[in-house]
Amino acid sequence: MKFGLFFLNFINSTTVQEQSIVRMQEITEYVDKLNFEQILVYENHFSGNGVVGAPLTVSGFLLGLTEKIKIGSLNHIITTHHPVRIAEEACLLDQLSEGRFILGFSDCEKKDEMRLFNRPVEYQQQLFEECYEIINDALTTGYCNPDNDFYSFPKISVNPHAYTQGGPRRYVTATSHHIVEWAAKKGIPLIFKWDDSNDVRYEYAERYKAVADKYGIDLSAIDHQLMVLVNYNEDSHKAKQETRAFIRDYVLEMYPNENLENKLEEIITENAVGDYTECIAAAKLAIEKCGAKSVLLSFEPMNDLMHQKNVINIVNDNIKKYHM
């Protein structure tokens, strides 16, 4: 089992954008000296539920601050960006970091974003797939020559070519059954979302297995990742209230048709929130449900920076003791 971090960079009544960005930098430099494998940065637009609209830009900055840890995007939304620009930036970061960059990507989860970026909502899945093909060609061969309904141009060289053979490691966020099935056919590992229920994660994992097996994909080589929120406190009530405040605005935005309190309770129960026993039990169950080989942790629900670092140290000690 491998462990990394992810940053959501939410802002709310207790956290302003400057504080969120500075904390991300400080925690990144701190964990670079520890036993974590990677850090991935969340992309969001047009709300306080994530102040990073350009995770590749942030990745470049954080790679420059660090020496050994891998860094990349958690969910770079390829449907709303030009695929050649994504490939150029990914290859450049791969070169500059000598292979430490990771490209986590995603389809667009918000219809309003598709419209604002002038993308055809009615052809979203097809556009997503075509964008990935262009990016994948560029990362693996250094060239692309698309001829589809969305992009058509002569063969070009995407410079610089990737440092890593085959391009930087790629993961796709499990945002829908369509995406999961598409990823399974290609053998692209998933990133399971922190706000999906264990039942949804299990359903996605089982569907991935079935489709991958049908297409002859070697599942032993697939290293799915699982996002988990962390708020450890022996005062379990405080941890849960703190986490509730941290995610409330996000849940309101992303789940407008669900009962707010029920969804908040589900997320808190199925992430590592509460006292030590509750955190371990919730994380263990979530991992079992989806079969992830790597866990990405966000310590952001804890308001106090020193408390964040103390909990990071506890996790780091356990990594060293049990997973190295």
UniProtKB/Swiss-Prot annotation:
Belongs to the bacterial luciferase oxidoreductase family. It is an enzyme of class 1 (oxidoreductase). Heterodimer of an alpha and a beta chain. This is Alkanal monooxygenase beta chain. Gene3D superfamilies: Luciferase-like domain (3.20.20.30). SUPFAM superfamilies: Bacterial luciferase-like. The keyword Lipoprotein does not apply. The gene is luxB. GO terms for biological process: bioluminescence. Its EC number is 1.14.14.3. Pfam families: Bac_luciferase. The keyword Membrane does not apply. Light-emitting reaction in luminous bacteria. The specific role of the beta subunit is unknown, but it is absolutely required for bioluminescence activity. One of its GO terms (cellular component) is cytosol. Keywords: Flavoprotein, FMN, Luminescence, Monooxygenase, Oxidoreductase, Photoprotein. PANTHER family: BLR5498 PROTEIN, LUCIFERASE-LIKE MONOOXYGENASE. It comes from the Bacteria. One of its GO terms (molecular function) is alkanal monooxygenase (FMN-linked) activity. It catalyses: a long-chain fatty aldehyde + FMNH2 + O2 = a long-chain fatty acid + hnu + FMN + H2O + 2 H(+).
